[in-house]
């Protein structure tokens, strides 16, 4: 997997102060996307141990609430993202994981993206999912943590427990 950037002390992509990993590669290509430079899977730089350590250093700070995966689409980078999320949950159990994706919660839950991959396992690593493609005709600048009104901010843990989508409230 390649990535474009690791943003530190971010307060725009999830609750609290966060570190954000901007992955390369997105299959959605939403018109007027804010990050079209992240669409190509080969763009950016290879995600390596140095990048992982940079993230872990940030997550070890008391004031950092957690990590946000964005891009690109983290779900399109399933294996590397899943393994990194798993390691973060083990090393930093009190930190939250947010994930932005163009896929819907239902698509991920049904494993309908690519057969043979454990998307339920991925969902179990995520605390809050911001789902759905960006739709320029539904753009709303007053929405918190999302760009268009079709997107949802989902409490994944509660959604899995209640077997229905439960929106995350701030």
Predicted segments with their positions:
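Non-cysteine beta-strand/loop elements that form the S-adenosyl-L-methionine
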Residues: 127-135
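P-loop/Walker A phosphate-binding loop and immediately adjacent motor/lid segment at beta-alpha junctions
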Residues: 81-89, 139-170
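Conserved Radical SAM active-site core
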Residues: 2-3, 17, 35-117, 121-122
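N-terminal [4Fe-4S]-dependent radical SAM core
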Residues: 1-22, 35-41, 165-166, 170
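Short glycine-rich, flexible loops that bind phosphorylated cofactors or substrates
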Residues: 76, 137-138
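Conserved, mostly hydrophobic/aromatic
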Residues: 21, 73, 129
């Amino acid at each position: 997997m390649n990535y474009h950037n690791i943003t530190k002390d971010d307060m725009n992509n999830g609750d609290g102060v966060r570190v954000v990993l901007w992955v390369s590669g997105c299959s959605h290509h939403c018109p007027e996307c804010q990050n079209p430079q992240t669409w190509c899977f080969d763009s950016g730089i290879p995600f390596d141990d140095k990048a992982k350590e940079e993230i872990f250093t940030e997550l070890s700070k008391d004031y950092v609430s957690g990590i946000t995966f964005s891009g690109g689409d983290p779900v399109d980078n399933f294996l590397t993202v899943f393994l990194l999320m798993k390691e973060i949950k083990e090393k930093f159990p009190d930190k939250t994981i947010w994930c932005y994706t163009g896929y819907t919660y239902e698509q991920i839950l049904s494993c309908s993206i690519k057969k043979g991959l454990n998307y339920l396992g991925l969902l179990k690593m995520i605390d809050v999912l911001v789902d759905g493609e960006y739709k320029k005709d539904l753009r709303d600048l007053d929405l918190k943590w999302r760009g268009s009104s079709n997107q949802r901010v989902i409490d994944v843990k509660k959604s899995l427990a209640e077997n229905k989508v439960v929106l995350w409230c701030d």
